[in-house]
Amino acid sequence: MYREDYQRAAQAANQLLRSKNNRYLDSLDAGNLGTTQAIEPQVRSWSKLCGWRLTEDPQKDAQLPVQAAAHWLRTAALNGSDAVFYLQKAENNLSLLYGSAQPPTFSSLLPGCRMELVPCFSPATYQISGILVGTLHTERLADAVAADTALRDIYIAVLSLPLSDRNVEQLLQKDSALLGQLRAYATADYVSGSSTRRVVQRPVGSIPQAVTCLENEIDNLRKNQGTGFAYTAIRFGAASQEQYRRLLALLTGAMQSENTEASFEPVRWFTLSPTVRPLAIPTAVEQNKVLHIVSLNTLQDAAVACTPPQRSYPGFWLEGQSDEQLFPAVEAFHSSGLAMKIGTAIETSEPVMLSQ
């Protein structure tokens, strides 16, 4: 009976290590993913962010968009709503859309925020698309994509399925209970020596690694319990194989991290069938359970991934940038009053009007 208890504990540890941080995905390829039970974020309202007005404080200008995205995600989580940050480039024209149950209240945090409701928005279908999961340790993702002029017909979508505070507490309790059970079997007594017999403790199988994994996850849950968590995935696609490979390299490069703790989930990706909808999350089967391909992330990390660019681009204009910052991305503007045509914008071929 004593030996059987250790065997059951070792088996539970192996199963836990395979499931935590999506390690089971390492043995799968895209052909193992299912789409019949795929889910899509439930979004009722889409809003396009066209730009905002910078302050005179560069540090504040860098913090405000992150705070706005974090507030948007936290509000969605408290309302039990999914959220999607959708970035699209079409011939270098940039579109940034935020989707959730209600329009985001960015204007309360971003000065001069310009947002437009986009009724009946439907994401475009691309020739080739994929899904990427992992810990969202990334900064200025939108800038990296927008600034790459070789990416002319692509999209990325950061999908966020927030956990309620109650779900986080339940996960914390489940992990804590399992941790207590595994700790009791992490080591076993062994008799060493013949003439001078002594008892030493040795680790049992992978139980110590499972204990460390649980400790890291519990620590992460407790540290960020007040700000929230979400299951996330990044869907992305392009109009050609060349652009798809370039976009994939950019995304994986942007999500590199020096974090080597057991709670850190490495980046994994799969190229999907063209029939998979652009915001769908496919499934995989693990231990006879159907699991959706998502990663557990803090809302704060998800917010950083959903942050708009810190420079102007065609289709997205930051008011107050210096001339040398704005020049490559200057866009045509229109005045509601008297105006005089002074030329044609190179990027958009639209008439440029000078207000009188």
Region spans (language model):
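Extended, folded cores of ATP/NTP-driven motor/assembly subunits in large transport
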Residues: 1-334, 339-345
